[in-house]
Amino acid sequence: MVAQAEQDLGIKLFAVHRLDSPTSGLLILAKSAVAAKQFTELFTAHKVQKYYLALAKGKPKKKQGWVIGDMAKSRRSMFKLLRTKENPAITQFFSLSVSEGLRLYLLKPHSGKTHQLRVALASLGVPILGDDLYGGMAADRCYLHAYCLHFRYGDEATGWRDYAYRDVPTQGEHFAAEGVIEALVEWFEPNTLAWPAKGD
């Protein structure tokens, strides 16, 4: 992905975070080593708020709240959620019914574990639509999308600015459903929503 962007733009780029291979959407690439270092520090300090969209079939164990637990490698490159919380994966989420048996999830990870969101939804009994690895129903794609990024960036000399980037998914027939489009109007600015409190 980075190599393709470098070729398209004709400049050297630096990756500062990653997306799981089946995930579409927003990815920050820095144009200098200095900017890459700054963004890496922001991500490490969890100062970049990331929001993802996912679709899943079925009824979840809960419709909103938190998924918190340690993660461990399982079989076939999979991970599983544990009951322990020593170095947990932490995910906050909302969901809305968008059609019969299909729910849209707005996910806010507070940690950056591999497969974190895929494991979180699987642990709720609703693996992501099209996520073959975790038992999602077959579909034309894996319905996980990096939807929004919100962060403050700058320095003392030039000042600090708040940035918000949003990318509405355009690939996948289920993302084009009327119920999804209506939900995205409600979730247009994820950082302003009243997110579920811990314990929900």
Label for each model-derived stretch:
Residues 57, 96, 108, 152-154:
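A generic structural motif
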Residues 18, 111-113:
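An acidic site on a long C-lobe helix of protein kinase domains
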Residues 39, 113-121:
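Short beta-strand segments enriched for Tyr within beta-sheet-rich domains
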Residues 101, 105-108:
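Short histidine-centered loop motifs in beta-beta connectors
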Residues 1-90, 94-100, 143, 170-176, ...:
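RNA pseudouridine synthases
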Residues 120-200:
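Pseudouridine synthases involved in rRNA/tRNA modification
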Residues 102, 114-116, 144-146:
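Active-site lining segments that contact anionic ligands and/or coordinate catalytic metals
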